[in-house]
C-alpha cells in the first residue's frame, strides 16, 4: 500500500484496480475510499507522569475543544498550544525533554476560557520543576538561573551596582542598607532587577522617585541588600532557588520597619 502526497500516515484507504459501476469505469484512483481516520497507538506513559505531579492533575481533564488555541499568544506565532500539548502527551511525547515545555508564558489566557479548568499555570511550573531536577534545562535558562544564584539577579551584576542608577540623580532617596541606625519608613520600595540594572528601567525608577517625593511619601529602598523576587525562577521550575530568594528578601522586609511594601512590577507582586 502506497501513500500519495495528499495521504496522511494515520489514514487508511481501499482502492480497486478494476471497477465499473453502472457502465462507468472508475478503476484506480477514481474509486479510492478512505476509512475513518483514527490514532490507534496511544502511549499514556508521559501523560500519566504529568498528571501524577503535584499541580499537574488537571492536564488529564482536557477534552480537545480548542478554546485555548484562539487565546494563546504563543500559538498565534508558532505551533504551541495547551490543546496540542495534551495531544502530544497522549501520543507518547516526553514533555520533560521537549522544547515545548519552555514556550508557555503562564499568561492564564487559556484558563480563563477553558470549560474544564485545565490549569497550565500549575501544570507547566510543575513539569518544569521535574525537568530541572532531571537536568533538562535550556542553556540560556541555565545561565540565567546561575546568575541569580550567584549574584541575586538574572543579569549577573554585582549587588553594589543596584544603586548605580542613583548617581548624578539629584532627587533624595533613602538607601536603608547604608544607614547605621535606619529609622522606620512609611513605604519600603522594592525596586526590582530591571528598574535597577536596565537603562529604560532606570528611567522608570527615577520617575517613581519623583512621584514619591512630590507626594511627600516617606520611603526607603533596600539597596545592595535587595535580591531578585524569584517569580520567573519559580515559573521555570526552580522552586528551591525561589524559596532561597523569598527567605532572603523576607528577612530584609523584617529588618527594616515599614508600614507598606510597594513593588515595581507584577512579578514581584505575585512572588511576595
Where are these regions (language model features)?
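Iron-sulfur-cluster electron-transfer modules
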Residues: 59, 76, 86-263, 267-272
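Ferredoxin-type iron-sulfur electron-transfer modules and their immediate structural context
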Residues: 2-103
